[in-house]
Amino acid sequence: LDSKLRGTVVLNIGKTPGAGLAFYNRLQNTLSLTRVVARPDSMEAIRKRLLGSQRVIVVVTSDDYKKYKTMLDSLPADLPVIYVFLMPLKSMLDMEGYWKKAAAVVLGHTDESVIQEYVADVLVGKAVADGRLSVAVADLFKPGDGVTITPKVSRIYRPEDYGMDSKIL
C-alpha cells in the first residue's frame, strides 16, 4: 500500500466492535487511517464515510458481511477497495463479484491476532505473502495457486508457475 495516500478508511465487519482491531492497530503504525466499525443500523452513514475516502480496506472476520453487501455494491467503481478476509475461505464463496472488482484481496483464513498483524505487515511490505490456496477462489484462482517461500533460500521462478512455457521462451 502506498503510505503517501491519505484518506484510507478501514471498515471492520465482524460480530464484535473489537473484530479486526489487531489488524487496524498494526496498520496504523505505518499508514494514516480512520477506522469504522460496521453496524447494520448505520449503513447510510458508513457509505457516506467510505465515499469521502481515497481508499477503503474492508476487513471481514465473520459472515456478518452479508448484511453489508448492498452498501458495498453501491461504492463507486473508481474507489480502490481492498478486501481482507480473516475467516475460512469456504464461508465466503459468494463474494466472487467483489473479488473481481477489488484492488486487492487478502485471505488470512483466521482472525487470530498474530495473523491479523502479519497480514497488515504484508500490506505495507514489512512481511512477505507465503502459501498456496487449498481451495479454488471462484474462477479466479485454482487450488495450489500462490507462492511458497522458504526462508534463507533464493526464490526460483519457473515460467510454468505463471502460465508460460519455458520451452518457447
Task: Outline where the language-model segments fall.
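Short proline/glycine- and basic residue-enriched helix-capping loop/turn segments at helix->loop/beta transitions
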Residues: 167-169
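Preference for extracellular/luminal or secreted protein segments
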Residues: 1-165
